[in-house]
Amino acid sequence: VRYGLSRHTVRKALGILAGDGYIESFQGKGTFCADVLRQIHGTGNIAVVTTYISDYIFPRLIQGIDEVLSDNGHSIILKNTGNSRQKEARFLEELISKGIDGLIIEPSKSELLCRHVSLYETLDKYQIPYIFIQGLYTEMQEKPHILMDDAGGGYLVTKHLLDSGRRNIAGFFKADDRQGIERHKGYVKALQEHEIAYDPDKVVWFHTEDRRKKPALMVRNMVRQN
């Protein structure tokens, strides 16, 4: 090894420097001087990372965020992960290195284990405030977040149908996001209150990858069977 140092010594030295905040390492990218990363504040840029941009409530959500940021002299940096963990991690690395004053983020596949917690720890280290919306990783329950009452919503819509005299109620829930898990809880609660047995054949779980095909296919199958 150059300079006559063993690899073990080099790794130990880098570990000490990283622990003291002098350097920052990114998997697949390399090791960088932390002085560069400390220049991230004062940019006036607030990053908004969502799973989708044009679907569901996101257009209005993003519009509202942008209006508030603009009124307060900030600029928005918009990123769309497509609910991909890999994209989320890549965007976080990019945003940290380029410089942001804050982050609003909807986590990707929030019900699954987050394997890039270290990137959020980097945000904490450099005192970059961030807040989760729409979902929250299980490992980060203590972090600032704004969530809808998905369990309550699942309960209310199911209860409405039951109160209307319906008994054969199917439920479609997303398995890899927190919202789907919580809505399922509400669905189950409403059935239990009306003393209706839970039927797993009436529950369809789908994932990000098959969200555009599986629900429609299962609806057609259910209609044919009835």
Predicted regions and their residues:
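Bacterial carbohydrate/catabolite-sensing allosteric modules
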Residues: 20, 67-75, 90-101, 114-226
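Residue-level marker for beta-strand->alpha-helix junctions and adjacent short loops that shape enzyme
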Residues: 30, 53, 110-111, 137, ...
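A short, flexible N-terminal coil/short beta segment enriched in small residues
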Residues: 28, 40-49, 163, 168, ...
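Short, flexible, glycine-rich and Lys/Arg-enriched loop motifs at helix boundaries
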Residues: 37-43, 106-120, 207
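N-terminal helix-turn-helix DNA-binding module of bacterial transcription factors
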Residues: 1-41
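Amphipathic helical "hinge" segments at domain boundaries
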Residues: 37-102, 109, 188, 192-193
